[in-house]
Amino acid sequence: MAATWTAYAAGVTHAASNKVYAQIFATASNTQIIQIRRIWLINAQSAAVTGVISGTISIGSFSTAASAGTPTTITPVAHDTNNAAVNANITINSGNTTNGTAVNVYRTIPFGSDEPATGTFKLENFYSTPSTALIWDAGFEDTRISPLTIPASTAGGICVYGTMTAVGNIDVAIEFTLT
């Protein structure tokens, strides 16, 4: 079984311009294969905000890392405490305000930043409920489908990014393996 980690970015605020919610990026010196198995979005907005149901969040691959802004380093948590530490040539962070150089977009979804609530029958409450969404699960149970992969000795990364109205915040969880 491959060594598995979860990288969790908590409370990342939305931005009116492009925003990097979470990225995993490897330098060309990286010696491990990174495979993205699952990605979750969690609407973490708890206080009442004006209903906002417009905006998109995407998953894409990048040839250069996002760099603008002041990113927050994400320390991944190993699923097995016997796993070796993540390679120092792998960077995991969130909060950048400018994307790196995009190569591919794998998925784009609409996402609402309104607080999830079921107490009223407003459209935005239905749009943001459930508050947790699995947005990438390809290749986890089906060995015929490859997960998102960053090959060893290749500079590149996978990024969860979007353009939303600057209201609310989100958590992002990325489950990945290293081999």
Residue ranges and their predicted role:
Residues 1-179:
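Surface-exposed, low-hydrophobicity beta-strand/loop segments enriched in small/polar/acidic residues
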